Amino acid sequence: MDAYAVQHFYNNARKPLAPTTLHSGNLPAAAYENVMFIRKLVCRENAPGAHERPFCAHHDYNKENLSEKSRL
């Protein structure tokens, strides 16, 4: 997915009032796979900073869909 396709999705193809979290199914499958691949590269290629460690420490970590109880 190129930059134009991502821009088109965010500005034209989204449904009004639809959830916008990464894991909600609101992104096309190819875009979702690209984002997840980039996240994995960031975790493996660079030493993670404090703000990146939650993404890197647990492979099943899902920041967007955490319940309110688990955030406290």
UniProtKB/Swiss-Prot annotation:
Pfam families: Baculo_8kDa
Recorded family membership: Belongs to the baculoviridae 8 kDa protein family.
The organism of origin for this protein: Orgyia pseudotsugata multicapsid polyhedrosis virus (OpMNPV)
Lineage: Viruses, Viruses incertae sedis, Naldaviricetes, Lefavirales, Baculoviridae
Protein name: Uncharacterized 8.2 kDa protein
